[in-house]
C-alpha cells in the first residue's frame, strides 16, 4: 500500500513540475521561400522565469548567403508585431554543414519571425529577400 501511495505522489510531483514546461514550450515550423526552397527549420518558443518569450531558431539546408542570387553577406532575424515595423534581432550564422542557430529573448508574445538575406550586418530595415518565416502565437 505504501508503494502505491509513494508512486502516486511521485507521479503527481512530476506532472506538477513538468506541466509548466510543456505549457510554455512550443515548436513553430519555418516556411522557406522560393529563394531557398530546400531550407528547413523551426522556432522553439518558451518562457523564462520573468514571463519573457525565449526564442531558439534552428535551420538546416540553408545555403550560405553569398551563394544566393543576388549574393548577400548576412542572414538577419527580424521580429514584427502586427501594425508595426520589423525590428532586427541579430545575425543567423550558417556553418559549413548549412546549419545554423539563433537564440534570443523578447517581451513579445504574438509576432512574425522572418529571416532575410542582407548585404549589411546591421540593417535598419529589411531590404534583401525574405528566405524563412513563421508566425508565433503565444497568447
Region roles according to the model:
Residues 2-3, 23-139:
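N-terminal targeting/export leaders
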Residues 2-11:
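Bacterial N-terminal signal peptides that target proteins for export
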Residues 11-20:
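Bacterial N-terminal signal peptides
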Amino acid at each position: 500500500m505504501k508503494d502505491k501511495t509513494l508512486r502516486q505522489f511521485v507521479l503527481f510531483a512530476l506532472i506538477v513540475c513538468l506541466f509548466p514546461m510543456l505549457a510554455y514550450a512550443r515548436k513553430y515550423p519555418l516556411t522557406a521561400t522560393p529563394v531557398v526552397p530546400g531550407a528547413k527549420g523551426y522556432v522553439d518558443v518558451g518562457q523564462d522565469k520573468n514571463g519573457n518569450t525565449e526564442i531558439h531558431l534552428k535551420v538546416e539546408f540553408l545555403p550560405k548567403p553569398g551563394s544566393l542570387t543576388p549574393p548577400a553577406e548576412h542572414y538577419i532575424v527580424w521580429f514584427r508585431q502586427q501594425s508595426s515595423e520589423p525590428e532586427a534581432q541579430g545575425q543567423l550564422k550558417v556553418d559549413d554543414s548549412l546549419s545554423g542557430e539563433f537564440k534570443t529573448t523578447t517581451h513579445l508574445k504574438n509576432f512574425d519571425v522572418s529571416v532575410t538575406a542582407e548585404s549589411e550586418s546591421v540593417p535598419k530595415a529589411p531590404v534583401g529577400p525574405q528566405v524563412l518565416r513563421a508566425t508565433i502565437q503565444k497568447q
